[in-house]
Amino acid sequence: MTTQITPQQYGVGARFTLSVYDSDYVRIILDALSAADPTGLEIDTGDISTFISGSEQRILEYLAEVISAAAATGVHVSASILLSRGCPGELQCELPPGVAALGADPIRLASVGRRARAHWSLYPLLDAIKDDATSAPQDRSGGTGVPGDHMEPIYAAIKGAKEAGIYSASDHFATRLDGDLADVLETVANAWIAVGANVQHVVTHVTISMNSPTQV
């Protein structure tokens, strides 16, 4: 991310819902939220979900800490996470005219030591423009070229998940991931960031399950 445009200005953020399948769910959720470090983040927890805004690295660190703390109780927990970067799509976007897609550094998370299974989907919301089938993506503002193939970055992301050893299977409307919670979140976030280097507005959604009684 450049120093001229903050993550908030570029619309970098997350919205997530933590679900705990236990009668003591209120305490477990509140304790998990309290256990995470909010430094450098804007956090707003409402009656439906929690909004987080900040750098990609800090957002994912916070999510890992909250989910890990809840899972440490041993009860079945799940988290529904939406990550978004780029405009339009965010109430606080202040992106100057003419700004193309902005890249960001890949995130790195410390191993959690707890298994997570997930369903993951990636949505590039603006196809890159290519002058021909082999050229690099171009800014849309020129009005020339043909739409890029939006499936191309999705297939690349799935390939990356396979290379990382996190890919488990292809399910209906989602890719199944399986591994350490940190590795799952890294795979999801770094694919989201990588696509965002060429496509300004990118959204990814992941549902994570831990300690599930369902055997797979």
Annotated model-derived regions:
Residues T2-V216:
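Charge-rich, low-complexity N-terminal segments
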